[in-house]
Amino acid sequence: MPWQPYHTVWTLLVFGWIGNYMIRMALSPLLDPVMTEFGLSHAQAGFLFSVFFYGYVAMQIPAGLLGDRFGRKRVLIAGILLVAVGALATGLARTLVVLGLARLLTGLAQGLYFANDRPIIAAATPRDRLAVGQGVSFSGLGLGTALGVVVGGALGEVLPWREVFLVLTALPLVSATLIGRFVSDPTRRAARAPGPGEGMTVAAVFRHRDLWILGLAGMAPIWTQWVIGTWGPALFAEIGVRELGRSALFASLLGIAAPPGLFAMGTLSDRLLAQGIGRKGVVALSMLGMALSVAAVGLTVQQRGPVWLLAVLVFVTSFFTWGVWAPAYALMAELFPQRVMGIAFGLLNAVCFVASLLAPYVTGSIKDRTGSFAGGCYLAAVLGVVGVSVAMAVRPAFRLGSARAEPEVVATR
């Protein structure tokens, strides 16, 4: 297929995600020196990591409202520039309080991205490529996760942890420049465009039953993602991988699995939809695979299994964890008109990311109490099974041939 304008949009927003996630994830392999410097337990370190998400979650709904009102591209670029400020503040922090505030600012800044980039992708992408477009463009999170963990770990072996964040400050500056130059803003065009749910109000978005169900189900993959995202290097350290760079390299499999997981599940969802099979089935299938594989991760850690096996299981778990989002976001883009899509995506992400406030701390607490991360993995598996049941409650009832009714049933309320 020749290069299309929407490919440019996908590519530049992927690069934006990479910069954001490298700054977000670099703290994971650097937690050990941070814990040593400030005398933190695993639970306290987990809370420090999760401080980012308090800002991130708090900004989701305002970000959608701001983008719908003032322009998605404008809000997107403002957020990216604030990410650079947050990274700089992290690198300059000399006390634990200042470090926590810097991470909170970084979370607030990155919270402006999601609710505005998803509608831009939806507006730029052909309808028959919607799940693939949402998946491919979302792969930047995985690539940024992998690079953040690997680069953070590698730099952490040769630089003080603060200087790592100073180096990473350049990424969002480049990203903001490229997006500002080459990505157009669909906000005004969206306000005039007819479509399903054209008369939907912001209040109707907040009353939307299936958005809340999808958000509650989405808490399960977010929980698993941030168990591995926070404690991935420590999982490998528990079974004997002591070198920071090596454990970070293995933990980066969480991000490496994102492009194939998102592309595979997005392609499957688009093809099944063309045959009349709804997207929620692919969402549930991905969650089930995630639940089974993260349980196997816990068992491998508990039994002190071989490193290669844990690496494979982390990759498989991550493949299914990321795979949830391509069909889920495509379904969202079909259910809501562009005019309120920012607030819809923001509300969905706010609900899902409540799990990120708890997963790092709870998993760290389980480690402190039991001496192992295995229990935290088992808890993630249980939540994954619950998520499957919740996802299947999205209307209409699952049956062959019903998929084409999904957007009409929900979007016109």
Regions found by a protein language model. Give the residues of each.
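Cytoplasmic helix-loop-helix junction between adjacent transmembrane helices
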Residues: 102-141
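Conserved MFS/SLC helix-loop-helix module at the cytosolic interface between two early adjacent transmembrane helices
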Residues: 58-94
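Helix-breaking motifs and short loop linkers at transmembrane-helix boundaries and internal kinks
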Residues: 39, 71, 92-98, 300-301
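Helix-loop-helix hairpin linking two adjacent transmembrane segments in secondary transporters
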Residues: 137-181
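Structural signature of the two symmetry-related core transmembrane helices
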Residues: 74-88, 280-295
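Extracytoplasmic gate region of multi-pass secondary transporters
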Residues: 27-28, 209-262, 325, 329
